[in-house]
């Protein structure tokens, strides 16, 4: 691990549509409403856990908040941290601006953890990501993209289908109604997605099977796939689609949340684990992810592996899937955070050495 004591700024975003409410809550920055699961009473936030881990590692952590105002960007330009630990998901609540934040940090010449702007935008636009997967021979469900007034077909697809926003993450826009069985249901869902989220609708083959998550630590050249995590959907009521809906993931008071859980994937033979690992690594590299990331997959009953999407900056709370996988690999939470720091610092050091060599 990096031996030197580092000044590390935890960069995170907050937003509130009511500026008056924001002013009143300055001492307790609000999360985006759709991420409210992160602020469950008595549970530490991911940034608080990371802050404590950095202290245990001997570093000097601090918080840096992006609140959607230009002033916060100006303040970031004066940041003197040795490394930015990037936890941002949006700017002023706009998820499509996530890559802009990272691009801005790049322009400032600051070191930071996680994916660069290109990787974020490739992963965020699910239709583009799926085209890249297909180019690299990585299986992904056949799909079409519905824009207002036109549909862009990539393949012939058949029902049942799942319809979701092309740009959102965190299962936003995915509920029991997302799985459609006929043209009427499909068109109604497409219209709902376009109106509610102002986003193209991704129309995708619904793949029956197990929901498998592969956490990955490492660079493009050298990456380690952590033990597989399964979101067990088997106890969902009959007739309820076996999907990772928003309620399943975040709404603790719902029946579907209580009936599902993430756990170390069991009953996977070595060949299947290798196939899942190889697929996850291929997707990680295809989208140029780095330091850490998570690949969400479906394992079909016939053994086929389909990549559903990639998450370049997965949630790092200690009770969530990535940390769960790291723990199963033998890493404590503090060691996991230390590994991410080491990867980011090594990457920046190697880039500096390469630049210096090129100038000789």
Regions found by a protein language model. Name each.
Residues 68, 181-182, 332:
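Alpha-helix N-cap recognition
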Residues 3, 183-263, 267-278, 301, ...:
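Phosphate-binding site of ATP-dependent enzymes
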Residues 1-111, 118, 122-124, 147-153, ...:
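ATP-binding N-terminal substructure of ATP-dependent carboxylate-amine bond-forming enzymes
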Residues 17-22, 169-172, 253-256, 319:
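Short acidic/His/Gly/Ser-rich catalytic and metal-binding motifs that mark active-site loops
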Residues 6-12, 76-80, 120-202, 207-210, ...:
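Active-site nucleotide/adenylate-binding loops and adjacent lid/helix of ATP-dependent enzymes
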Residues 132-137, 267-360:
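ATP-dependent carboxylate activation and anion-phosphoryl transfer catalytic cores
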Residues 61, 111-112, 140, 161, ...:
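Hydrophobic beta-strand scaffold residues
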